[in-house]
Amino acid sequence: MRIKTTTKTEYQQRINVLVEYINNHLGEDIDLNKLAEISGFSRWHFHRIFAEFLGEPVGTFIVRMRVETAARLLRYTEIPVKEIAYKVGYDVPSSLSKVFRQFYGISPNEYRNNKDYVIMEPNRKCPIWN
């Protein structure tokens, strides 16, 4: 997709606002219509621009942010896994465990108990603002 420089900067600012909103509301249901509204884009344009700038669909981004946040909480706090699941937006702790294992190949408890285990982020397109 080819975007003019001024438009690209404006879009980048809108995406930054969305990323901040998502990170501040991980423990809540994140409504995609609300995100489109916050961005000022139509729902269709919002999905397209978000994926173009961040290299992944918005739903995938939200799940990844939830799992990465859970990993940090597991590593650096003593908060129980059940409570972490709720903090990052899962109604059922087993849902976090399932997604965590899909992303990292290890359960949240195994990750917490093995301090030598390092999670490597999957290869993905770097955000434009970096």
Regions found by a protein language model. Name each.
Residues 1-13:
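Short, charge-enriched, intrinsically disordered boundary segments that mark the beginning
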Residues 39, 88-89:
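Core residues of bacterial helix-turn-helix
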Residues 42-43, 91-92:
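Short coil turns linking two alpha-helices in DNA-binding domains
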Residues 46, 50, 95-96, 100:
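Short hydrophobic/aromatic patch on the recognition helix
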Residues 98, 112-116:
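Short amphipathic recognition helices of helix-turn-helix/homeodomain-type DNA-binding modules
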